[in-house]
Amino acid sequence: KVAVLTHWGADNIRYAGISMGKGEGFTLHNLKMNYTDRCGVCKDIAGTLIAFLRMAGFEAFPAMTMAGSRVETIPADHFNHCVAVVKLSDGTMMPLDPTWVPFCRELWSSAEQQQNYLPGTPEGTDLCLTPISDPENHYVRIKAQNTLDEKGTLKGTFTIEAEGQSDSNIRRIFTTGFQSEWAHTMERQLLNVSPKARLKSVDYGRTPKDYQRAPIQITFRYEIPEYALKGDQGEMVFKPFVLNNLYTQVLSY
């Protein structure tokens, strides 16, 4: 339920920084206004989620954080972003950020790990710290099956799979880009490997925009003439395909 409600708020309440006049500050608006307008800033998106969670029977509260920065342990206004927390059955507080997870398979953006936040509970709470997200939550896997002929032409297929922040990065062309650019974007990945690459086909499923269904998976079929060069003794010289400028935007090295 928590995941469903978080993603509904993330995907259906549009971020729009419209001035509401003086004195707004951190004031949370009521659900009727947020649900009717279907837009607002972070506090409106978080406020919608908090109201939904409470209606679903959860204890949920607003929380403040400083996106991208540390919050000092002194009484001062160090906050620039409103998020939400929900109390789990074991009593722990789970941070949720619907503003930063549209089209993302997370509930809190792991681009903001080890970040301070201050829950607004009735009894009061000290500064908290968001947990580290293990690399396994953001894997990228590329499996290729290729053959080289005597002329150095590479033919084959590769499949890329990804999760978490890596999924969001690779899937972005489908969730925020124009559909007319999908095939061109896929082809550009191969052209990064070689300007002679030819994309034969690409399979990204029927609904690549549906990020909640499963981790992203794309299969390419291609041909690259003169991928390998012949040495003086007839040997083939080439760089391993999956290490040759393929999806470099999600590599961490």
Residue ranges and their predicted role:
Residues 1-253:
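A sensor for short, sequence-defined functional sites
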